[in-house]
Swiss-Prot record:
It is found in: Plastid, Chloroplast thylakoid membrane. The lineage of its organism: Eukaryota, Viridiplantae, Streptophyta, Chlorokybophyceae, Chlorokybales. This is Cytochrome b6-f complex subunit 6. The chain crosses the membrane at residues 5-25. Belongs to the PetL family. The keyword Isomerase does not apply. InterPro entries: Cyt_b6/f_cplx_su6. Component of the cytochrome b6-f complex, which mediates electron transfer between photosystem II (PSII) and photosystem I (PSI), cyclic electron flow around PSI, and state transitions. PetL is important for photoautotrophic growth as well as for electron transfer efficiency and stability of the cytochrome b6-f complex. It comes from Chlorokybus atmophyticus (Soil alga). The keyword S-adenosyl-L-methionine does not apply. The gene is petL.
Amino acid sequence: MFTAISYLGILVGALLFVTITFLTLRTIQLL
């Protein structure tokens, strides 16, 4: 169970990082 929570945390962190990077690049392109 602890392993599943850790894996889920890593997955959410990676998804959040990708989303922030995508939004940043898109904002730069709009400017």
